[in-house]
Amino acid sequence: MHCRPDGDHDRRLARCHEPAPLLLWPLRLERTERPRRASCVDVHGLPPLEMPTFLLCVKPELEGLVSFEPGEGCDWKLDFKQSAGSEERKGVVVDPQNEEEVPNAKGDTCQLVMKFDKKDKVAATLSVVAVKGVLRAFTSEDTVAVPIAAFECRGLEPIGWTPTGPYVVRTAGGVAYNVGAEGEDLAEDWCDYDEKSGESVSVDASIQFEFRLHKG
């Protein structure tokens, strides 16, 4: 004679064969930090900002010449306006070889640090940069202004340019001339006589220019 298990026994047996509950642990996501650009500066804990780059585009009037470009030792004499204000500074000379520490940025350097007002908490900065595939010499075949220099700016914008020497110009025969002495304004037209071609060569002192925001 077989004895039938009571109800309590059946329930205990059923519980023994139930699958163990699945434990779900919270998934921890690690945030990946994006690398900081050396040209971006943290000021008072603010996140890094992208700094705009302005291109100096020129269209000189050439006679008997095929190209015009900055020479070695050429400084940039610029006028600036305050990005977040109305202050302006004129005739500021920027030396591409000069290096100054960027405020509140470890190891970063630039070519110009300036304040429009002594009360400004944060200084404006400018770096002379090389934009590959964009900057080049102006040629006699160009019909519009071309970019010959680039400036990465924070807190200021370039609004004016005074050409200062030296610049290098070339003839079709490959003869090169320096236009203007180092650090001197091109206040007058430059002219010379090219013996190889037997023709006069010249650069008009009134050089058309404009600043364009680089969208690279």
Give the residues covered by each predicted segment:
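Glycine-rich, aromatic-bearing surface loops/beta-hairpins
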Residues: 149-216
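Compositionally biased, low-complexity segments enriched in small residues
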Residues: 5-6, 28, 35
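Intrinsic-disorder-associated, low-complexity terminal segments enriched in Asp/Asn/His/Tyr and depleted
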Residues: 2, 8-10, 42
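Structured domain cores in non-transmembrane regions
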Residues: 65-77, 81-160
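Eukaryotic proteins' extreme N-terminal regulatory segments
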Residues: 45-77
